[in-house]
Amino acid sequence: MAAAAAAAAAAGAAGGRGSGPGRRRHLVPGAGGEAGEGAPGGAGDYGNGLESEELEPEELLLEPEPEPEPEEEPPRPRAPPGAPGPGPGSGAPGNQEEEEESGLVEGDPGDGAIEDPELEAIKARVREMEEEAEKLKELQNEVEKQMNMSPPPGNAGPVIMSIEEKMEADARSIYVGNVDYGATAEELEAHFHGCGSVNRVTILCDKFSGHPKGFAYIEFSDKESVRTSLALDESLFRGRQIKVIPKRTNRPGISTTDRGFPRARYRARTTNYNSSRSRFYSGFNSRPRGRVYRGRARATSWYSPY
């Protein structure tokens, strides 16, 4: 009887259990077939069933069924930054969120990609500026070379003359002594203008102080003018009696003294008067030491004409 009651209780517990697992179901007297044979017998069977339930609880408790664990999805490969992503609605919402998060994480390299063209543009601009600076330096060097090679317009550069040319020019020149210190080349040219065409007037100056030395040289267009100008020897010029004699040529390597004045190095102020018949000589020596006058125009240059 006890075994039958325990089996009936187990079957009733399995069939009549509610929503909660392991819920006990008490036997009602007379409900079962075997227990309904009699009231006394049924009550006794019920009591024996309770005792069996209390003595053997392990048989009445049902073990809860284990819930199935969700299967983990394999990791999906990430698409490269430039590859087109899946369209809207093609994937699950979870996948879309993951893609959005990955896009946010991978957005930082995109900013660097945007900065790269700007950096390249800055580098290109710096290279252009360096090239322009190099071109400017080259132009400046070319201008300096041209200025050193050719004299500026308006100034007479030194012309190297041969000994024959110097002697020929000296044969058409005269020496004028006792010249007033305030005299100008234009005044001397006007004083000797009647003797012939004057190519150049040179007033010698001291190379340290720059003051006139008191004598000058006048170059004519031809030798005939030299002979005519000798007639003005001991004539008055600015209230002083001047001395007029033919000019002598300095020969290289020979130290000469002309009328008590050393003729080695000195500064000069020169005025050149060009005519259709005359030939212009910028100087007798190559070293510039003086102020040169071309015609009536006045320019500055340094050279030693005699």
Curated annotation (Swiss-Prot):
Coiled-coil spans in chain: 115-151
Gene: PABPN1
Signal peptide: none
Asymmetric dimethylarginine modification, residue list: 238, 259, 263, 265, 267, 269, 277, 279, 287, 289, 291, 294, 296, 298
Domain notes for this protein: The RRM domain is essential for specific adenine bases recognition in the poly(A) tail but not sufficient for poly(A) binding.
TM region positions: none
Family annotation (InterPro entries): Nucleotide-bd_a/b_plait_sf, RBD_domain_sf, RRM_dom
Ranges of residues in domain RRM: 172-249
Name of the protein this chain belongs to: Polyadenylate-binding protein 2
Subunit architecture: Monomer and homooligomer. Binds RNA as a monomer and oligomerizes when bound to poly(A). Associates in a ternary complex with CPSF4 and NS/NS1 and interaction with NS/NS1, blocks nuclear export of host cell mRNAs. Associates in a single complex with SKIP and MYOD1 and interacts with SKIP in differentiated myocytes. Interacts with NUDT21/CPSF5. Identified in a IGF2BP1-dependent mRNP granule complex containing untranslated mRNAs. Interacts with PAPOLA, but only in presence of oligo(A) RNA. Interacts with transportin. May interact with SETX.
Location of region: Interaction with SKIP: 2-145
GO CC terms in record: cytoplasm; nuclear inclusion body; nuclear speck; nucleus; ribonucleoprotein complex
